[in-house]
Amino acid sequence: MARGGARGCPCPSETSASGATAEVKRSAGRPCSRYRPPQTLLLNNRLRPFRCRYRSSATMLEHLSSLPTQMDYKGQKLAEQMFQGIILFSAIVGFIYGYVAEQFGWTVYIVMAGFAFSCLLTLPPWPIYRRHPLKWLPVQDLGTEDKKSGDRKIKRHAKNN
């Protein structure tokens, strides 16, 4: 049951905060509609070109799927080392500056700035992290597995008694 006009429009049956149903009379045969102030309508008209930048969600999805997302193992290692190094450097600089200035807030700000900077450098898959692509094995044919399961030796472990 909707309480307190949760449906967004003053319709005939609404409920109060106590949960009791109240009947609201419609005014002179007008349909039940939501009131929108003129400022809201003006704002919606101004924002329409920004919302319609991509004609459909499929076009937007195609654009996003064309961005590279993979990162090789050496790139991941480099990103992790850079991330830790930047945070450690910002923590040391922040601690020293905060100690000299006797302001703990500056220490926190400097460490937060270092964290944001390291995230900007390491989270996106920049080309520096994709220099060593993986070499995949070729696809094997299914015809090589003609052996019966009975031909295989069963490996048994020694008992630990």
Curated annotation (Swiss-Prot):
Post-translational modification: May be phosphorylated.
Family according to the record: Belongs to the SPCS1 family.
One of the GO BP terms on file: signal peptide processing
Role according to the record: Component of the signal peptidase complex (SPC) which catalyzes the cleavage of N-terminal signal sequences from nascent proteins as they are translocated into the lumen of the endoplasmic reticulum. Dispensable for SPC enzymatic activity.
InterPro entries for this protein: Spc1/SPCS1 (IPR009542)
Cytoplasmic side: 1-85, 129-161
Keyword field: Endoplasmic reticulum, Membrane, Transmembrane, Transmembrane helix
Protein's name in the database: Signal peptidase complex subunit 1
Stretches that traverse the bilayer: 86-106, 108-128
Cellular component terms (Gene Ontology): endoplasmic reticulum membrane; signal peptidase complex
Gene: Spcs1
Record bears the keyword Endoplasmic reticulum: yes
Lumenal compartment spans: 107
Subcellular location: Endoplasmic reticulum membrane
Chain residue ranges for the region called Disordered: 1-22
Main location: endoplasmic reticulum
Membrane topology: Multi-pass membrane protein
Organism, as annotated: Mus musculus (Mouse)
